[in-house]
């Protein structure tokens, strides 16, 4: 059974609200969030973005594939269809039907190559979902 894709109205090429969000989240945690959101932004020319539920979201057109959010002591890099992503490095956390996230903490080593692959796979996954209806 196929489920309808989640769609967000208002995604734009570069959302000034996200730049303001990044400025408001300065410091170590903000730098981590900005680093990984930049990776999402660079996935392709069709990437759009918006602030949704208080955090930066990366979309393919209006279909979201990833987000970042800053918490008290960590950053989440999240994936809207993360449950469907291959995760050989076992970075993904969460038990929901669709979403998963990777928790990043300052001073703790990050498997950057594996996280970059997850972001790439999330982008390719949403692209296939959009193209195949």
Residue spans of the language-model regions?
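Charge-dense, helix-prone N-terminal extensions
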Residues: 1-133
């Amino acid at each position: 059974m196929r489920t309808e894709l989640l769609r967000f109205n208002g995604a734009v090429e570069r959302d000034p609200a996200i730049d303001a969000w990044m400025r408001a989240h300065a410091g170590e945690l903000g730098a981590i969030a900005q680093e990984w959101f930049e990776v999402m932004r660079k996935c392709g020319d069709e990437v759009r973005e918006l602030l949704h539920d208080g955090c930066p979201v990366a979309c393919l057109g209006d279909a979201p594939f990833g987000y970042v959010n800053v918490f008290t002591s960590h950053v989440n890099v999240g994936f809207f269809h993360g449950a469907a992503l291959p995760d050989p490095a076992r970075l993904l956390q969460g038990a929901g039907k669709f979403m998963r996230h990777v928790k990043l903490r300052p001073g703790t080593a990050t498997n950057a190559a594996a996280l970059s692959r997850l972001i790439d796979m999330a982008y390719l996954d949403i692209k296939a979902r959009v193209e195949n209806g």
